[in-house]
From Swiss-Prot:
Name this polypeptide is given: WD repeat and FYVE domain-containing protein 2
Statement: the UniProt record of this protein carries the keyword Transmembrane helix: no
Zinc finger (FYVE-type): 286-357
Binding, Zn(2+) 2: C319, C322, C349, C352
Listed GO CC annotations: early endosome
Annotated residues for binding of Zn(2+) 1: C292, C295, C327, C330
Entry keyword Acetylation: no
MF-aspect GO terms: phosphatidylinositol-3-phosphate binding; zinc ion binding
WD repeat ranges, renumbered to this chain: 71-103, 119-148, 202-232, 245-284, 373-403
Xref: InterPro entries: WD40/YVTN_repeat-like_dom_sf (IPR015943), WD40_repeat_CS (IPR019775), WD40_repeat_dom_sf (IPR036322), WD40_rpt (IPR001680), WDFY1/WDFY2 (IPR042234), Znf_FYVE (IPR000306), Znf_FYVE-rel (IPR017455), Znf_FYVE_PHD (IPR011011)
Length: 415
């Protein structure tokens, strides 16, 4: 029978205490999937882009309800938004590869088309604006990244990837682009020329979201493989830490640099808040072997050993904490191990199980994340950390605004 280590941990509070996101508002009225949302920081409003071709701005009224102040229809469905509150400029990326720029009125009652770029041959999957260099970036499913000058609309440069672009974040001179192959390409833009710095490869499925912590110089990537990876870009040592808490495709990520938090959401409606102020441990590489590295029993593909010993081959498993290739009998123990990113139970070998039991002081099993069920898949999310507000859009076409101040201000783990 499978053993469970430190069962009390499941009922215990996380390193951030018992804080939970609090629902403040629900916005209904959309008739199609919502592809992107942006929460304003200076006004109480939400931008949305939907498959019904609409771009809407909801503002909070005196009756505490949100109503559309702007309701603009695009030629085809918008897939991505970017809004600059400093310049009142709205960028809208479309499914046909076009990018529109709008000037938004000061009273938020109208928006006027300023420019249009026909720069891609596939759906826009990411937009960005670097105010300091006056560059507008866009990436697309057509595998390309393009940047234009925001002053004269001229194309300043481009870069072609091997796979379709799925997500992008910008912190010039660096541009991070996730693709359908599960890679993150790191570019350095010098005099509008792209230079390949690195390609980060650890995911086994498409990248779905990227977010950047500029304070710690850390990049977070979410993927269809249910995994989140924290890439320590600024550390210079190539360290990467896995975060395992989702049982479905991770759809969107939001970093809260000041609070040292990470918000993630998946296709099943699970919202996670991760404590990124604690010491984490890198996951080991999985070892390869033709026999169990504990009892030496052959695995089912090791025909020679099976024939010589006259035994039936066993199925291979891996201990998640040491990476050993083991049989089922040698790893029938299950536990969480938050320092390594495992917030749900994972399989460990008998040796690691014994070490955890004999030296519990060396294995802190306190949860380092707060899970919250929204009960509908999340399609988009945006955080305004200074306000302590988070907005999500669900597969049920409902927009929810959450108060996350208690989560962000809660005490967290040690460095």
């Amino acid at each position: 029978m499978a053993a469970i280590i430190n069962q009390r941990v499941e009922q215990g509070e996380s390193s951030m205490g018992g804080a939970k996101p609090a629902l403040l508002h629900r916005i209904t009225g959309h008739v199609a999937r919502i592809n992107d949302v942006i929460l304003l920081s200076k006004d109480e409003g939400v931008w949305t882009a939907s498959d019904d071709r609409s771009v809407r701005l909801y503002l909070k009224r005196d009756n505490d309800q949100f109503w559309p102040s702007i309701h603009h229809f695009m030629p085809v469905a918008p897939t991505s938004l970017y809004y600059s509150e400093e310049t009142y400029k709205l960028l809208v990326g479309l499914i046909n590869g076009n990018v529109y720029e709008f000037s938004v009125a000061d009273d938020f009652n109208s928006m006027t088309e300023s420019r249009k770029w026909t720069c891609h041959a596939g759906p826009i999957s990411g937009l960005g604006f670097a105010l300091s260099s006056e560059l507008i970036f866009s990436c697309s499913r057509d595998k390309s990244i393009v940047w234009h000058c925001s002053e004269n609309s001229n194309k300043m440069g481009s870069y072609l990837l091997e796979n379709s672009c799925t997500a992008m974040v910008i912190d010039l001179p660096f541009v991070f682009v996730g693709d359908h192959g599960g890679h993150v390409t790191v570019l350095r833009i010098v005099d509008n020329q792209p230079n390949l710095v690195s390609k980060l490869s650890a995911h086994t499925n498409a990248i779905t979201s990227l977010t950047w912590d500029g304070n710690k110089k850390v990049l977070y990537s979410g993927s269809s493989d249910h995994l989140i990876i924290m890439w320590d870009i600024g550390g210079g040592r190539g360290e990467a830490y896995e975060l395992n808490g989702h049982n479905g495709k991770v759809t969107t990520l939001c970093a809260a640099p000041a609070a040292k938090r990470l918000f993630s959401a998946d296709e099943h409606g699970k919202l996670m808040c991760w404590d990124m102020n604690c010491k984490r441990v890198e996951t080991p590489e999985w070892k390869t072997s033709d026999c169990c590295q504990k009892c030496n029993q052959p695995f089912f593909w090791n025909l020679q050993a099976m024939w010589q010993r006259k035994v039936v081959g066993l199925r291979q498993h891996h201990c998640r904490t040491c990476g050993s290739a083991v049989c089922g009998s040698c790893c029938d123990n299950w536990t969480t191990y938050p320092p390594m990113g495992y917030e749900t139970k994972i399989r460990i070998c008998n040796d690691c199980n014994a070490r955890m039991k004999d030296n519990p002081q060396n294995f802190n099993l306190t949860p380092l994340a707060i899970p919250h069920e929204i009960h509908t898949g999340i399609t988009a999310m945006h955080l305004q950390e200074t306000l302590g507000l988070l907005v999500t859009s669900g597969q049920n076409r409902v927009i929810m605004i959450w108060d996350v101040r208690s989560v962000c201000s809660a005490p967290s783990g040690s460095q």
